[in-house]
Amino acid sequence: MSTRQPGTLAVHAGHEPDAATGAVAPPIHLATTFRHGPAGERLAGYEYQREGNPTNDRLREALKALEGGEEAMTFASGMAAMATLLESLPAGARVLFPDDCYTGLRMLFAEFLPERGIVPIEVDMADLDAVRAACAQPLAMLWIETPSNPLLKVCDIAALAALGHAAGAVVVADNTFATPLLQRPLALGADIVMHSTTKYFGGHSDVLGGALVFARNDALAQRVAHRLHVTGGVMAPFSAWLTLRGCRSLGARMAMHCANARAVATFLSTHPRVARVNWPGLPAHPGHAIAARQMRDFGAMLSIQLHGGRDAALEAAGRLRVFTNATSLGGCESLVEHRASVEGAHPRSPQDLLRISVGLEDAGDLVADLAQALG
């Protein structure tokens, strides 16, 4: 594992000068097929784009360096990464997952994985006693999301990893909100890290992707890789190139994202129309001490809950001018979303909640926009 700091790794990992030309920016290899010998022997290590190409391999090297893993795989989306991993489990596998989590993960557990005989078990991952009770029976996998979406719960990765391993589970951590610039779950005991690279890795709201980073290149990693190559949910080379380019500015962007989030959260925490601010950087947050221990900074995602319920939340969202009402997160622009309105017929998010992705605008402009929207 490299001794360099994550910000340095983000700039250099996967960006070695091109061997053929000396170019300091990596080329994009768009070829779908590669020349092989008469008997099918691979002459340069590649055969068909679905099974690998040089651009994706550069991104894989960057991901391994940033998360400190032995193996990494890139996918067409974060959902493809999650589905490929979970569908690699055998029938009858029991999977512990968080009560507050990404809607797409919840949909997999509710609609698709039970068809394969996989048994999902929902638990509050911030409650170690509840997790300990759920681990009384053997588990195949324990899924962590911290900070969580959209309530920004903080889970103790090291403690959960110990409980999961004692129950026989592979421990997976969704590190999308934090990125390896702020948090490195493998170093805390997790076995696999999952990312929607669409978010902070891409960083510009213009490229879809997902990734898995494995602490060890073990049998499960090889099974997932085989499934990826056969089922074809791979990341396209141009998407890999855009994501790799995003890596180079990840450290600078995350620093500004976090600074802006602190300014926004501090302002909102004293506003009379705001009932609750969910951001782990606030000392009043129930997970603040854990976040301070396992994170370098507290991230740029937060949510607020307003006095006046759904109507007040929608009114405030509609009055914003610098913030854009849109889904997703991690781009340069600040976004706001009434999550309950986009979660379908049976939303889990509170009706009074707005999720906020704090972008890279001037912090003063963001605070002023929130001030005028809240009145």
Q: Would you name each region that the model predicts?
A:
Residues 262-321, 340-348:
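Conserved small-domain helix->loop->beta segment predominantly found in fold-type I
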Residues 33-83, 88, 104-111, 350:
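Conserved N-terminal alpha-helix of the aminotransferase class I/II PLP-enzyme fold
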Residues 231-232, 319-328, 373-375:
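A common structural junction motif
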Residues 119-121, 133, 253, 318, ...:
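PLP-dependent enzyme catalytic core of the Aspartate aminotransferase-like
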